[in-house]
Structures are given as structure tokens and as C-alpha cells.
Amino acid sequence: ASSMRLIFGGNPGETMFTTSDIGWVVGHSYIIYGPLINGMATIMYEGTPLRPDAGIWWSLVEKYKVSVMFSAPTAVRVLKKQDPAFLSKYNLSTLRTLFLAGEPLDEPTASWIHGALKKPVVDNYWQTETGWPILAIQRGVEVMPHKFGSPGVPVYGYNMKLLDESTGAELGPDQKGVVAIEGPLPPGCMQTVWGDDQRFVKTYWETVPGKMVYSTFDWAIKDKD
């Protein structure tokens, strides 16, 4: 619930449009639970961003006065190939921010949709296992610029480490390593594997030599800033 205010900037009485499938964690967290707990209306949309035409999402933003939108880079890349008139024909004045997650957001895609919408485009990184963002820009906590090509900084509640997967050594800027989280995990994250606590520990917490840390199994490079 706190992420709705501190990360996504949603307010009670507003509308959120998350284009995810309800069978995926983003659908659970940000079509159902997050917006409704925060007193927002939510749009549940079934279909592609191209049917009946490439303006369908933007028509919903206009019709329901969407303030916060959450989608995926792949969907934006699909829309980038379409006639730009489908985007410009709708009134998107209520939309404050477009959030994107689910895969790496490349700079050309981010720059294109930012220029087309003339709205902030904010990346964020997380997993099914965490249920909410791990890395993000948290304007409800601290005002900071976002940088295309980066999902942001560690979210409150996460003690993030970038580690050498072979030695467990902590890495510095411009070094590639595995993204890890020191325990305890914050509320919202998985607590075990159903009926098999040992599998949970062995799979997620015992993969980095000499460290009892949660491994995301994802790789990253930390910027100097």
C-alpha cells in the first residue's frame, strides 16, 4: 500500500491503469490490491494494445481520466511501430506518469515514449517473489531525477548489495555482479516456498559463497551516482 503513494504517486479518488495480465504478479499487486487499498479506481483491460487499433490504451486514459499508468517496455516497443497519430489524437492531460517494468528498459524506447507523451517515464525493477519494486525512483520519499537506462535506487526496506557471484565480495561502481538483498526481506515479499522451507533457503539464500543473502539471480552494474 505504501508503494502506491511513495513510488507511484497515486492518490485516493484517482484512477490507475495497469496493462498487465491478472495472472502475473504485476496484475495482482497493481491492478487489484495496490490501487484499491489506496482508495483508487483501477482499470482491468483484456486484450492487446493494437485492437481495435493502436489508440485503444490512450482512449482509456482519456475516457477514465487515468492519472497513473503502468506497462511494460515490450508493449511500448510495439506501439512505437504504429502510426503516431493514434497517440496524439487523445487528451492525456490527466496522466502524470508512465511506469514501466518487467524487463530492461532501453534508452531509445524510454526516450521515444517520453517525447511522445511529454510525461515522465519511470522505470522500476522487481520480481514475482518480492511483489513490489526493489529498485525505483521514490518521489514520495525523496525528489531525485530519473535516468533513462537505470531503474533507480534501492527502495525503502531493501538492503541491497551487488556481489561477485563466485566469491561473495561486494562490488563497487562500474562492476557487474549479482543483485542481492540482505535479510530480513520487507513486507510484501515471499516468506517461503509452500510446504518446503528448506527449498526456499537453499534456492534463494545459499547461492552466494560466504553470504546469507537473498539472490535475485539477476545481474546489474551500479553507477557512480
Please report, for each region that a protein language model flagged, where it lies by residue.
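Conserved AMP-binding/adenylation subdomain of ANL enzymes
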Residues: 1-15, 25-67, 81-82
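Short Gly/Pro-enriched turn/cap motifs at secondary-structure boundaries
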Residues: 147-154, 170, 203-212
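Conserved ATP-binding/catalytic segment of the ANL
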Residues: 174, 180-225
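Active-site phosphate/pyrophosphate- and oxyanion-stabilizing loops and adjacent acidic/basic residues
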Residues: 2, 111, 149
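Alpha-helix/helix-capping structural signal
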Residues: 74-77, 103-104, 184-188
